[in-house]
């Protein structure tokens, strides 16, 4: 079997809600179709941007079923990580029948594991998984950073750990990862505004929030970077940069949902404990969207 190799733009899909906070499956299906038509390289349902902690088991399986049904052979990287081994394995068992190609597994949050604890946890997950795994390092949300040496150790010791989504915001750490990563191991940006730098250094792509809004443009930037066309990539980066920053004006996915609402693709509703975008964020995202489409 060929090893899965992730590269380019993977969209971390938002989960649309109706005005009464039910999952809007129709809007979700339309959003998935828009992603496919826009040329993204892979999709990432059930991750942070999808508000997965607020979803029921039935909602998770239905969202994954819809995604698989609509994307054909496009790779699906499904979020399944928790802060316990048993919880993560239970999510894998729940979701695997619905067709993911690989798992996105976050560094356990709240527990604050040491580097050795992180290594043992991911090795245990890898040994029990029938699908490839991408590590998700996002210390701003988890309270624990996976150092480059730990990620490389896992990449070398666990053949089915195939990549890492790196959202530490530390360029030195990302550079070390890229420099030492074994062949076929994908280093993916977890921050849209770091994608240009990460891919120019040798990384393979991005798991993007902004591509919910501008999938064709973010994909084109990644395509340019994969071809070492820095001139085109820089132009796209600068055009998209206000969107990259605006998507984090409040906790993700609050601003990106405001942007999607501006485009008429879904409501801006989020589930508690998140709250809808403030008036100032709505105004900001409206301006960003209007300016972005004016410059198209």
Q: Which role does the model predict for each range below?
A:
Residues 2-143, 153:
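Active-site beta->alpha loop and helix N-cap motifs at the rims of alpha/beta catalytic domains
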Residues 137-138, 160-161, 271-272:
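Glycine-rich phosphate-binding "P-loop"
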Residues 138, 167, 259:
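Short, well-ordered beta-to-alpha junction loops that form the rim of enzyme active sites
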């Amino acid at each position: 079997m060929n090893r899965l190799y992730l590269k380019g733009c993977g969209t971390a899909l938002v989960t649309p809600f109706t005005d009464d906070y039910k999952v809007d499956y129709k809007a979700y299906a339309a959003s998935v179709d828009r992603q496919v038509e826009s040329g993204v390289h892979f999709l990432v349902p059930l991750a942070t941007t999808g508000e997965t902690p607020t979803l029921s088991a039935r909602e998770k399986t239905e969202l994954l079923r819809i995604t698989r049904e609509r994307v054909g052979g496009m790779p699906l990287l499904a979020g399944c990580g928790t802060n316990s081994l048993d919880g993560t394995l239970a999510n894998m068992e729940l979701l695997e029948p619905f067709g993911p190609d690989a798992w996105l597994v976050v560094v356990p949050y709240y527990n604050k594991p040491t580097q050795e604890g992180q290594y043992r946890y991911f090795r245990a997950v890898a040994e029990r998984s029938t699908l490839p795994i991408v590590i998700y390092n996002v210390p701003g949300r988890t309270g624990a950073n996976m150092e480059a040496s730990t990620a490389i150790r896992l990449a070398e010791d666990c053949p089915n750990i195939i990549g890492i989504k790196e959202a530490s915001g530390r360029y030195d750490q990302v550079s070390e990862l890229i420099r030492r990563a074994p062949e076929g191991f994908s280093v993916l940006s977890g921050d849209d505004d770091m994608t240009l730098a990460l891919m120019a250094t040798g990384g393979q792509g991005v798991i993007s929030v902004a591509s919910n809004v501008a999938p064709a443009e973010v994909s084109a930037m990644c395509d340019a970077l994969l071809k070492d066309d820095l001139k085109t990539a820089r132009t796209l980066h600068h055009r998209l940069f206000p969107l990259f920053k605006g998507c984090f004006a409040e906790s993700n996915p609050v601003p990106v949902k405001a942007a999607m609402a501006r485009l008429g693709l879904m409501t801006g509703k989020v589930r508690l404990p998140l709250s809808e975008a403030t008036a100032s964020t709505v105004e900001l995202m409206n301006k960003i969207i209007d300016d972005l489409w004016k410059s198209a």
